């Protein structure tokens, strides 16, 4: 079996959100660490789309930024095609960096309003290639055609385009240096619903044509069902379930995954019993001991309150849940 393109093992990213040093010393306060991502592990195979889902603040976007080197690791290991991602900051790491690119969430904020579209798309080529100006102009025109725009658009400014067109420009920029792996951080969440499907279908077409691999971040489960091959579910910085898309939607195992799917309106599901999950997301600065989901879980017991679960195989899924492991709920 071929080696996965992306391998993430026990990756964590903590942020120091303590008050200033002098204030802490005078008040006798300890340092405060926000565990945005706290030990996630997963793999992404070549040509595959792995989607990460979860409520706001669960760490999805932090994982995205870790995978392209925008955030360093507090602990753990991330490898791209067998190479440690830390090599991107070393001499010679530019070749590795250009193989993975990112599409950002907000097409209104991620494009420089003072630059023409041609310069925006050509910027990665200036850094990573030795193309002549004429070659860059021709390449920009080809990229614009590839994402459904006209080559003449490279002389225009971002404000002259709609949101969907701006995101197409962002996609063209990400493709400028022929990457193998794209990290897509909620690329359609800022777009009108009528435009979302067009952009998603474009991304799927590009994946087939170019053999791309995607990490797709989203909170919209309908979008995830449309684009993903496998789905990872995050809660308070931890991965609670990873499963093939069809298996996860047909047979969710972790109680949190069940809660997310139960929130999807289902016209045909009238009369089906639904289990409401009480409580709110805990304070990430002071997360619960053991399984962080236990205050909201109807299946929690003493083990859940005192021992953090690890991911274990359950059918075709990897689930971090004591209740599933012990057979207290169907796994």
Where are these regions (language model features)?
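Short catalytic/signature loops enriched in Gly
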Residues: 2-4, 17-28, 33, 242-331
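ABC ATPase NBD coupling module
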Residues: 22, 27-31, 85-101, 119, ...
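Helix-to-loop junction immediately C-terminal to a conserved catalytic motif
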Residues: 68
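Conserved ABC transporter NBD signature motif
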Residues: 76-84
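Conserved ABC ATPase "signature" region
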Residues: 83-84, 134-152, 261-262
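A short, proline-enriched helix->beta-strand linker immediately N-terminal to the Walker B motif
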Residues: 176-180
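P-loop NTP-binding/switch modules centered on Walker-like glycine-rich loops
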Residues: 183, 187, 191, 195-272
